[in-house]
Amino acid sequence: MDLTEWIVTIIMMIEFLLGNCANFFIMVVNAIDCMKRRKISSADRIITALAISRIGLLWAMLMNWHSRVYTTDTYSFQVTAFSGIIWAITNHFTTWLGTILSMFYLFKIANFSNCLFLHLKRKLDSVLLVIFLVSSLLVFAYLGVVNIKKIAWLSVHEGNVTVKSKLMNIASIRDTLLFSLINIAPFGISLTCVLLLIYSLGKHLKNMKFYGKGCQDQSTMVHIRALQTVVSFLLLYATYSSCVIISGWSIQNVPIFLFCVTIGAFYPAGHSCILIWGNQKLKQFLLLFLRQMKC
């Protein structure tokens, strides 16, 4: 490896370790809290599932990164296809669980008198479950069609490396286009949640000012913490999606591919750290753990 690849390797390993530690920490804390209380809240269920999916996504990204850094001849096209399936599944659940978390914050925190909003708020758990199940059916249908066709192409041209390489490039570009189309929905929903939370916060501050009260009340702080979580998710998700699209179009350009994968890995690692710091329970456990480490 040259100097650039060594630098990318070090950064990737730091992100990989940080992301796994952060997500594993979330899983352990919520598991301990669940055993103590004998129940788990809806928010903790979503965050725990999100942490599990992000651990899987980090490992899938590491597999793709490893296949480009080291000799690609050691990787069969079937192994590459398998790692692609793992990435597609974990990426899908990471995206939609993050979107569902944004919706959860919106309906739990925002205050609107709209009849549809109030109806969805009353049925929130059922609404989120339906969204999760429908999105799951879509991803498995997508994987069934795309990967069966990809494996069939490669099997027909088993002995022709040149043709197989071209087919992989075509499949990568096609998958990138499908990725862009599929991710319009969760990105649009998350963006809508951000805008509605901002509007709700603005309306709340206006009411507080009208009644002559201060702006640092509990509802304002809850709005701000939710916005920090949702906005950070949206920005990191947009950055990650851009990296996936660029890497899909530049799969033969190894430096660009590795750079995009490394930047994209900050999404499942960085947002989990933001979740820990923005969640009162997780933050308290983290500070307690750090104090015990110092002793």
Swiss-Prot record:
Where found? Membrane
Q: What does this protein do?
A: Putative taste receptor which may play a role in the perception of bitterness.
What coarse category fits the chief subcellular location reported for this protein? membrane
User: Which sites does the entry annotate for glycosylation?
Assistant: N160
Keywords of this entry: G-protein coupled receptor, Glycoprotein, Membrane, Receptor, Sensory transduction, Taste, Transducer, Transmembrane, Transmembrane helix
The gene designation is Tas2r120
Q: What is the lineage of its organism?
A: Eukaryota, Metazoa, Chordata, Craniata, Vertebrata
Bilayer topology? Multi-pass membrane protein
Misc. comment: Several bitter taste receptors are expressed in a single taste receptor cell.
Q: Tell me one GO molecular function of this protein.
A: G protein-coupled receptor activity
One biological process term from GO is: detection of chemical stimulus involved in sensory perception of bitter taste
Q: Does the keyword Transferase apply?
A: no
Query: How is this protein named in the record?
Result: Taste receptor type 2 member 120
Per the record, ranges on the Cytoplasmic side are 27-45, 105-125, 199-230, 277-295
Annotated PANTHER family: TASTE RECEPTOR TYPE 2, TASTE RECEPTOR TYPE 2 MEMBER 20
Any single Gene Ontology cellular-component annotation: membrane
| Regions of this protein lying in the Extracellular compartment | 1-5, 67-83, 147-177, 252-255
Q: Which InterPro entries match?
A: TAS2R (IPR007960)
Q: Which family does it belong to?
A: Belongs to the G-protein coupled receptor T2R family.
Give a Pfam family name: TAS2R
